[in-house]
Amino acid sequence: AGDRTIFAFSEDYIADENRPTLGLSFKTALGELITEFRPYQKRLMPYFSNLLPEGHMRTYLAERAGVNPEREFFLLQALGADLPGAISIRQADGAGGTADLPDDSIDNESDRTSSGSQALRFSLAGVQLKFSAIQEARGGLTIPARGVGGSWIVKLQSQHFDHVPENEYSMMTLARMIGMDVPAIELVPVESIANLPTEMLTTKGPALAVERFDRLPNNGAVHIEDFAQVFGVYPADKYG
């Protein structure tokens, strides 16, 4: 009720000896499946909280969806069509979107009427402004409709620190030069990225395009789990 959430595995999942692993945090030290979890208030349990964006990106996507950014259950419901790794979130009855969000999860009347048409249905964890993008056969990158899909990540300039994309590009290039395995990267003009939301075109400087390691050429996805999820650490606590 309200902002109180409880996670539970389905009985079929629990009974399946060949079930896929959702995350190491759902197993005991001996590898047994944990099946009882405490309730959480407002925030989700750390595993799911770490699937959500942080900082300005979180605020931006929440505003587009008309959802209070602090109410994580409703935010995950709004963004859950395309999450990091191979996880997706949908309502138990198979319905999707924010049409069935309770009124008190939405900030105001204008957000309530616009949330369906304005929302972007994706999430990329972290604080940096970034979007998933499609590499077009003719060349160039396109932000897909609703933000869902794409095998590249486009990272925009930071609002707080100068030249973050250029710095990351330099570090990745140096890593490749010393023999480390790094993904394909490219610095691209922001204005060359098709379908990027117009409010992002004011960004000064190039964006960094990085090929996603959690996406496959056949539109498949690779299941991933970061250390914050493994150890049950909330995003705000992982930086220090």
Language model features by range: what are they?
Residues A1-G240:
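Phosphate/dinucleotide-binding and metal-coordinating scaffold of catalytic cores
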